[in-house]
């Protein structure tokens, strides 16, 4: 049997709530963070377009197992709609497809907001990652095809005006469910107002359970990044190489368990924790221990240990973590 290759990088686990700059793709951002932390494994919880800035939660190591819980979280965006043009991509990148000389008043925009609050039907943009017959919509759109993308329901918890800098632009903040396309909001509001519109600025400020206070910029990460060992003219590390100190960088990592605030959390004793590590169920003790739960997580010494479910007061693990 062939030996499995040794994993490259450090076995660090947790969340880096990255303040992605404009112009950087989500995959590029993950690669950058993985490299900075010299991590074995990394992934993100929800794509953010290159033209957008703001929160991109990036999971390191064992935290990648909790990505689905963050992806399901409520999102908050701040965005600017420029009126008078509808574009092929519904943002600044596209070509104008429809134009209008009309500009909406603040009163007209405010009167429209209730129609975009609650559960609404929305057609994703032509340039989106939606799959049509196995192909991404944006790939088909780049080839000049106009594809029929079915409408789907999304939930808008809150949509409000936060600025009206001039007649051409309105600034909004929206709190919405997974799967909401802010570009579609701009397009549809423009059509309803009879003036057309597209996104000219987009920033994500929250992905539940994380808030804007959790975000770290690339500059902050690079300021505490431990430099690589010096190399000679041939590219070989000069020995003895000093040990790299990642402590300041690692201090910016949020515990893996923070992603599971939506689940009941039950602390275990050391003996119970050992049983769960081996994949065995345990009877939960204590007056406040839940008797039933479709999903729950357990902790040991303040660190996440496992996700599972509770049945008749017994926790049954489905996913065990090796690091908190």
Swiss-Prot record:
Q: What GO molecular-function term can you cite, just one?
A: tRNA pseudouridine(55) synthase activity
Cite the InterPro entries for this sequence. PsdUridine_synth_cat_dom_sf, PsdUridine_synth_N, tRNA_psdUridine_synth_TruB, tRNA_sdUridine_synth_fam1_C, TruB_C
Q: Which residue positions are annotated as catalytic?
A: 49
Q: Name one GO biological process term.
A: tRNA pseudouridine synthesis
Q: What SUPFAM superfamilies would the database entry show?
A: Pseudouridine synthase
User: What PANTHER family does this protein's entry cite?
Assistant: PSEUDOURIDYLATE SYNTHASE TRUB1 (PTHR13767:SF2), TRNA-PSEUDOURIDINE SYNTHASE (PTHR13767)
Write out the similarity annotation: Belongs to the pseudouridine synthase TruB family. Type 1 subfamily.
UniProt xrefs under NCBIfam families: TruB (TIGR00431)
Task: Show the HAMAP family listed in the entry.
Answer: TruB_bact
Q: What does this protein do?
A: Responsible for synthesis of pseudouridine from uracil-55 in the psi GC loop of transfer RNAs.
The name of this protein is: tRNA pseudouridine synthase B
